Amino acid sequence: MKHVLLYCRSGFEKECAGEIQDKATQLEVFGFPRLKNNTGFVLFECYQAGEADKLIKEIDFQSLIFARQMLAVAVEIKDLPTDDRISPILEALSEKEGFPRCGDIRIETPDTNEAKELLKFCRKFTVPMRQAMRGKGLMTAKDNAKKPVLHLCFIAPGHCFVGYSYPTNNSQFFMGIPRLKFPSDAPSRSTLKLEEAFHVFIPRDEWDERLAPGMWGVDLGACPGGWTYQLVKRSMFVHCVDNGMMADSLMETGQIKHHMVDGFKFEPDRKNVTWIICDMVEKPARVAHLMGEWIIKGWAKEALFNLKLPMKGRYDEVLQDIENLKQFLIDNKVKFKMQAKHLYHDREEITVHIQSLSNISPY
């Protein structure tokens, strides 16, 4: 197997391709990406057989910004007959040496309007395909979360990639997309960005500790309160910094303080802030530096923020801003964890998370 399939947002294939090319080169795996604009996926072809498995094992999936899912492709099948789609897939896999026995199956499509028309078929096809795979010993008799995940990705009727991912190094979500419901009482749809970020960046078993009731947060560029809403509903208190008006529903909770000042000049009176969150429409380098300052001063322990992307050179801008921010923290002797992701609810932006591991006094 020498192909790696990556899902991404439609229109960001170039950025996803540049990223997998860089990661593969760092591991001394050489190849090239195949892509078409607005298809929602990238296929990376390694020059050497067997190196696809190496990539999906050794590239830390959490380090990928633009990829929603990463899997090794065993076979690409075209022109599946409508009267029997299962047999050609079973036959193709039975001829593939080294294909692992899987514990789960996901029959998916790329995230495009055209491909998503196949989702109804994918849902209906999952049960018979799973039964057939188990019958041939290609899957465990019962779901096993410790075994690889079998993926069938249909990019057109009768045309699919068949491959696998490792559960310790993939997206846990179907199609790589968390399924979140918009809360009817939220002030704006931007609230889903922050909720998704919590799902992606914060392990669920750490939510009670790191997103605890009674914590204080600061929301820069808060108006009308989509991001603030996520903190308030977790019983946190929030300094909302924006010259615009906040939603009345949030003001009435008694959990927020509204500061009508410039987000770049705001400093909390009491240095008891755990979270700094920021969704300001500003140059990404400026926002990244500001978030770094909050962390190195000890004003916040964790930061979640968006970096707005330029029309051109998006991947280069992201690399530069992330690298500069990391170096800024290192130069100030801060120990930290950092992740960045182009989330499903992001558009022309990425979301970055920093967790400070240093005990920095804010005084």
From Swiss-Prot:
Superkingdom of this protein's organism: Bacteria
Example of a GO MF term: S-adenosylmethionine-dependent methyltransferase activity
UniProt main location, coarse: cytoplasm
Known EC number: 2.1.1.186
Protein residues bound to S-adenosyl-L-methionine: 190, 223-226, 242, 262, 279
Catalytic residues in the record: 308
InterPro entries, per the entry: RlmM_FDX, RlmM_THUMP-like, RNA_MeTrfase_FtsJ_dom, rRNA_MeTrfase_M, SAM-dependent_MTases_sf
Reaction(s) this enzyme catalyzes, per UniProt: cytidine(2498) in 23S rRNA + S-adenosyl-L-methionine = 2'-O-methylcytidine(2498) in 23S rRNA + S-adenosyl-L-homocysteine + H(+)
EC primary class: transferase
Location of this chain's protein in the cell: Cytoplasm
Any one GO cellular component localisation term in the record: cytoplasm
Any Gene Ontology biological process: methylation
Key words of the record: Cytoplasm, Methyltransferase, rRNA processing, S-adenosyl-L-methionine, Transferase
Keyword Methyltransferase carried by entry: yes
Subunit structure: Monomer.
Function noted in UniProt: Catalyzes the 2'-O-methylation at nucleotide C2498 in 23S rRNA.
HAMAP family the record matches: 23SrRNA_methyltr_M
Family from the record: Belongs to the class I-like SAM-binding methyltransferase superfamily. RNA methyltransferase RlmE family. RlmM subfamily.
This protein's name: Ribosomal RNA large subunit methyltransferase M
Origin species: Vibrio atlanticus (strain LGP32)
Gene from which this protein is expressed: rlmM
